[in-house]
């Protein structure tokens, strides 16, 4: 059963509520939000752009969750979830379009894939993502999923300098191929990066790492979104204790 999660941001005074996005109308809201975010920030080539939507064949196989502003009624954050059973019917996870995933079949326990996560620019703060994480926790708990996996993006507008610098940090602290190895089907081209070049982790990627997720290999170049996608894997029993409360999990 979905637990209503409402938070009031101390500065803006917004009231936010998590919800399951069931039905065609709610899905269209999610697709419209995705379009606004992805087209504006990545200049992405999106199916459904002529209708102001980001949609694809995976949408109908996924569960969709979101965060709504109770005062305006607007959907302000969303993500979609594809579980192992739906992936079996499809013949693949979405991530397998970009990566060869060695070890996926050997994972012990149910797997949930997260994707198309986006937050409206004016709502990018700890409160909004915490509400979204809380609803994700409900789905994880209900399904008994042991693994959460997906892709996190690094912008490539600078030709890949940020991606290379970010990957240097990720390799040093967050690389783990013990459970799964992700080989990109379209690797980034070689690029010399100065040793002193630093870069901030993109917010969503940082959020995953704080939860305890690991990267499982090198990034894949996504020309449609003009980003480098990094494959991440979060093992349920390795959640960072500091952030485990977002997932209502005992660790």
UniProtKB/Swiss-Prot annotation:
Its EC number is 2.3.2.30. GO terms for molecular function: ornithine-acyl [acyl carrier protein] N-acyltransferase activity. Pathway: Lipid metabolism. It holds the Pfam family Acetyltransf_5. Catalyzes the first step in the biosynthesis of ornithine lipids, which are phosphorus-free membrane lipids. Catalyzes the 3-hydroxyacyl-acyl carrier protein-dependent acylation of ornithine to form lyso-ornithine lipid (LOL). Belongs to the acetyltransferase family. OlsB subfamily. This is L-ornithine N(alpha)-acyltransferase. It comes from Pseudomonas aeruginosa (strain ATCC 15692 / DSM 22644 / CIP 104116 / JCM 14847 / LMG 12228 / 1C / PRS 101 / PAO1).
């Amino acid at each position: 059963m979905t637990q209503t999660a409402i938070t009031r941001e101390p500065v803006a005074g917004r009231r936010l509520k998590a919800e399951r996005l069931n039905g065609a109308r709610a899905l269209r809201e999610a697709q419209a939000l995705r379009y606004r975010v992805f087209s504006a920030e990545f200049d992405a080539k999106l199916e459904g752009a002529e209708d102001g939507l980001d949609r694809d064949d995976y949408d109908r196989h996924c569960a969709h969750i979101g965060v709504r502003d109770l005062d305006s009624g607007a959907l302000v954050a969303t993500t979609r979830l594809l579980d192992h059973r739906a992936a079996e019917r499809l013949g693949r996870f979405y991530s397998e379009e970009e990566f060869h995933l060695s070890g996926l079949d050997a994972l012990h326990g149910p797997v949930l894939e997260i994707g198309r996560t986006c937050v409206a620019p004016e709502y990018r703060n700890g409160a909004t993502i915490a509400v979204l994480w809380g609803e994700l926790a409900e789905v994880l708990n209900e399904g008994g999923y042991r693994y959460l996996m997906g892709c996190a993006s690094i912008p490539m507008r600078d030709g890949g300098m940020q991606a290379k610098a970010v990957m240097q940090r990720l390799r040093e602290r967050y690389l783990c191929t013990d459970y799964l190895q992700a080989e990109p089907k379209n690797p980034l081209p070689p690029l010399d990066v100065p040793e002193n070049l630093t870069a901030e982790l993109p917010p969503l990627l940082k959020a995953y790492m704080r939860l305890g997720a690991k990267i499982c290999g090198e990034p894949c170049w996504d020309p449609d979104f003009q980003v480098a996608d990094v494959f991440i894997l979060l093992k349920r029993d390795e959640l960072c204790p500091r952030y485990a409360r977002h997932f209502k999990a005992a660790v």
